[in-house]
Amino acid sequence: MFYDYADSGSWTESTYRSNESDFQKIKLRQRVAVNMTNRTLETTMVGEKVTMPVALAPTGLTGMQHADGEILAAKAAEKFGVPFCLSTMSICSIEDVAERTTKPFWFQLYVMKDRGFIERLIERAKAACLLYTSDAADE
């Protein structure tokens, strides 16, 4: 079950197959003998300086692959100077990730019917950035 979760797509896997096909079409153009001295990938994202315009996206149940999966991902993002976003469906708690990192992280919010739970979750998150997920059915 864990392998299928990590290495497949949902339902008919049509999006998974489409993404795989699209990635195969990407061709990187190699450039050699170019002076790279003054080039940088540094930029800002939601007002914060980052080393490159990349963020570690929220991945639900990362802890199924490794008990401290979200913590390790957050620490790696911090080490390399890019944002980390914790999923509502993470195995590690907001508090556990915050305790083991020094920078604020983003939090992906799935809005559910229990508004009290959502309000408490937002209060716990106190993230630098709150990402609202609108692709999930309201159960």
Question: Over which residues does each language-model region extend?
Answer:
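Glycine-rich anion/phosphate-binding loops
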Residues: 65-72, 114-120
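Active-site-adjacent beta->alpha loops and helix N-cap segments on the catalytic face
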Residues: 87-101, 115-120
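Conserved small/polar residues in nucleotide/adenosyl-binding loops
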Residues: 132-139
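Conserved, mostly hydrophobic/aromatic
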Residues: 56, 77, 135
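An N-cap/entry alpha-helix motif that binds or orients negatively charged groups
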Residues: 1-48
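Hydrophobic faces of well-ordered beta-strands that scaffold small-molecule active sites
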Residues: 54-57, 84-86, 105-109
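Internal gly/pro-rich beta-alpha loop/helix module
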Residues: 116-131
